């Protein structure tokens, strides 16, 4: 797979976030709605070398881009420590598209999947 085809996450357009997040999925009882919560610990996007305002989280793969504006910064002892991005889907097709991105992102970053029981 060519490097430009790798799935990636960006908080600033054109700048890939190298920190791999913990991702938690929840789904509604009907299976069509749900959310994915991305938790980045000490992301580069919060480092002193980055400038500008974070206006969202872009999930980019060979199919295109998924965007969410639901991004929060969590502070520990007055220092920015975590970025938390939440992607909400409301249809099965949105979920299917997200899962294609998630699988591509996992392959690009050598990640696996585990189900909480």
Curated annotation (Swiss-Prot):
- Give the Pfam families listed for this entry: Psb28 (PF03912)
Which InterPro entries did the record assign? Psb28_c1_sf, PSII_Psb28_class-1
Gene3D superfamilies attached here?
A: Photosystem II Psb28
Q: What is the topology of this protein in the membrane according to its UniProt annotation?
A: Peripheral membrane protein
Q: Which family does it belong to?
A: Belongs to the Psb28 family.
Q: Which HAMAP family match?
A: PSII_Psb28
- Name assigned to this protein: Photosystem II reaction center Psb28 protein
Gene (name only): psb28
């Amino acid at each position: 797979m060519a490097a430009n085809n790798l799935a990636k996450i960006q908080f600033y357009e054109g700048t890939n976030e190298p920190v791999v997040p913990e991702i938690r999925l929840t789904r509604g009882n009907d299976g069509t709605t749900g959310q994915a919560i991305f938790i980045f610990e000490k992301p580069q996007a919060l480092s002193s070398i980055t400038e500008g305002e974070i206006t969202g989280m872009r999930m980019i793969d060979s199919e295109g881009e998924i965007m969410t504006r639901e991004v929060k910064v969590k502070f520990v002892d007055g220092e920015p420590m975590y970025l938390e991005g939440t992607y909400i889907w409301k249809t099965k097709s949105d979920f299917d598209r997200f899962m294609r991105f998630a699988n591509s992102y996992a392959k690009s970053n050598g990640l696996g999947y585990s189900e909480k029981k």
